[in-house]
């Protein structure tokens, strides 16, 4: 099955956990990776699923992160190139 990736970057690990919980409840997506930088002060959450589900999940994550004032960036990648999975350690 071809799927899309959704990424949301926030400040602070606690905020990332709260956001991820809502993202997973908002749509049929799977949590696949996290990247922590600056000792956990900057966290990127990665989910995958069907494009519409990933968009809904990322939109929900952005709303939660904005509410807490911790949003840094977000992105949805439809049909990601297989080389991206090496970066995420999913190959």
Question: Where are the regions a protein language model picked out?
Answer:
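Helix N-cap motif at beta-to-alpha junctions
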Residues: 48-54
């Amino acid at each position: 099955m071809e799927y899309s990736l959704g990424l949301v970057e926030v400040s602070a690990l606690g905020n990332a956990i709260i956001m991820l919980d809502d993202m997973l409840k908002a749509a049929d997506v799977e949590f696949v990776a996290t990247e922590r930088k600056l000792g956990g002060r900057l966290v990127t959450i990665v989910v995958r699923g069907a494009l519409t589900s990933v968009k809904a999940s990322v939109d929900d994550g952005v709303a939660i992160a904005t509410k807490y004032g911790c949003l840094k960036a977000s992105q949805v990648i439809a049909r990601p190139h297989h080389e991206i999975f090496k970066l995420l350690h999913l190959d």
